[in-house]
From Swiss-Prot:
Name of the protein: U3 small nucleolar RNA-associated protein 25
Alphabetical list of InterPro entries matching this protein: P-loop_NTPase, UTP25, UTP25_C, UTP25_NTPase-like
Residue pairs linked by disulfide bridges in the UniProt entry: none
Subunit structure comment from the entry: Component of the ribosomal small subunit (SSU) processome composed of at least 40 protein subunits and snoRNA U3.
Keyword Ribonucleoprotein found: yes
Compositional bias annotation for Acidic residues: 11-29, 86-109
Job description of the protein: DEAD-box RNA helicase-like protein required for pre-18S rRNA processing, specifically at sites A0, A1, and A2.
Family: Belongs to the UTP25 family.
GO cellular component: nucleolus; small-subunit processome
Span list, region Disordered: 1-111
Top-rank lineage group of the source organism: Eukaryota
Amino acid sequence: MQHAPEPGESQSEDSDDSVSDNDDDEEDAQPTSNAYAALLQSLSTVAKQNEHQETHRRKKRKLAGEDLQVAEEPQQKINRNMSNLTEDEPDAVFDGDALDEDPQEDAASDDGVQIRDAVEETQDGFESFEVHFANPDENDLAMRLRRISENQWSAKKLHAAGGRALLQVPCADNTAFDTRKLRSTRDVQLKARLAENAQKVVGQFNDGHEQVIMPSIFGYQDVLFAARTVHNAARMRDITCLHALNHILIGRDRVLKNNAKLAAANDGDDVEYRDQGFTRPKVLFLLETKQACVRVVDSITRLFTFEQQENKKRFLDQFHRPDQAFSDDKPADFRELFEGNDENEFRVGVKLTRKTLKFYSTFYNSDIIFASPLGLRRAIETGDPKKRSGDYDFLSSIEMVIMEQADANLMQNWEHAEFVFEHLNLQPKESHGCDFSRVRPWYLDDNAKHVRQTIVMSAFLTPKINTLWNKHMRNFFGRLKYTPDYSAGVIESLSHGIKGIKQTFWRFESPSHLTDPDARFKYFSSTILPSILRTPKPAEGGPGILMFVPSYLDFTRLRNSLVDVNISYALISEYTDMTDVRKARSHFMNGKHSLLLYSGRAHHFHRFNIRGVKRVVFYGVPENPIFYEELVSMVGKSVERGETSRAEASIRVMFSKWERMELERIVGTKRLSRMVGDKGDVFDFVY
């Protein structure tokens, strides 16, 4: 089981990925802005070095007051765009052998039938793609981008069974909130090659959250879905994979169709098609474990029937581990996250042709990139020793990001996720064989980050995920946030002998979020710790006080402060050796240690069922409400075993006004305002 490394810690593994090669792409644009001129000038030297020295047909265009000579032999351009395999000089290859690819094989697989499909399926059949990516209205786009820069969002609450949905659009026109109801995949504009399998795999959309969020997902709005569960995870995975595949196929077929038109054009025809980006990769899946990657690939292969899957065995050998399973006494969410291959440093590129799914394609030659935030950061930072700042050009044209388990990534190092988002859709440093005459204008104007669709799924919402929403989910089409209904809170559904045990919530004053750790420690030292020291030791066993500390920084601070306190205690953190863990649990259970300091990440990675717990003190409210249930149930089990009485057992929770989201999930929405805003600072619950 992999723990999150500290910023300087390494967790390398077998070669499982590939990162770079010069590549061509499938997105378009006409250079009509100063930004384009500046970008082209900065890259012209590199571009000229990569061009073949052959006789070219020349076409002249007017660009920002200058004549730009674009020299390309038509058939060479067509082959390059269809196969995206002009690998002039590999920039870097990460972790093992990137596989050689044959341009002729690729062109043959895509050429005939796929061009016919592209011609048969009219571009007008995919309205969302057309107005969002292909031909957005310039005036409307400019207006929306201006409102985004001023943080002006019009908002509307949507009716959502079992949850709350907020739709925001950077537009004052109320018609922007109008959406088409989607009852099943038949109501979604899908490529013909996906429609039948989509109906079999996904079919009808349910009347709960799916009816609310599907128009935003398939309408290319950003979506923050903070209601992911073990039960709906597979379904949400199938839906997002369907959307990603559809997006790739629409864009690819459009490029092939335009290639055919260019090939048929006469020398004097002034034709241009803006249908590409700077580089080929279009979809980025940010996943937590290798096993999660296997599940996504499985979903993709059920939705699209490939005649061949190249290097699939190698992929399964490195990513799939069916023999690693846990017993049923571990909770379902833990098993879903950690069963199978739970390694959390990986990245792998995948390329789609009409008949073949190719694993381990170089990043610049891939349509989809699967990666963990840690693995992708490692690739960017260490990929090419010649580039001191790292290579991230392969992320310049990402049009869709799907982050499947943001809550799990919080328990790793969230800085890795922030790092990845900071490096998305930046202007490339090199040309990578790009045909600038076909790059879309909003790429050249550095607006790709506002056109990109970002879909983030999480079991719950946190301030860090909210920051991601505010900073990186700024789609010009709008954004939707969906959260579950917490009207009751988990406190009303506790079991395992909790009935009759007092649960006390202590609010302390915290004037600033930045100084909250200091205020929390001061309150603990002056109020909570003295009461712990006064706890009488029973005739048999010990007081059984477990202190749960969500933050590792707080854990370290408490550990250091207890050195000078007259109390016997044990420590369990995510970095504690398993031998020491067993010793700490044993001494705590038999009463040798009165206090057990227990970190939030230790519980996340191991979900220990600790014996001898008679009292729990929460140094902070756990972000995951399941943790609260599990820790409180340890007290209930001690009561059921007769190790303590209901009168002696207790639950105490420290909280401040900065923990509203965490507190709401525990006590429920109806109690939240009173507990945060009332004059009183102690709140007792007994069920």
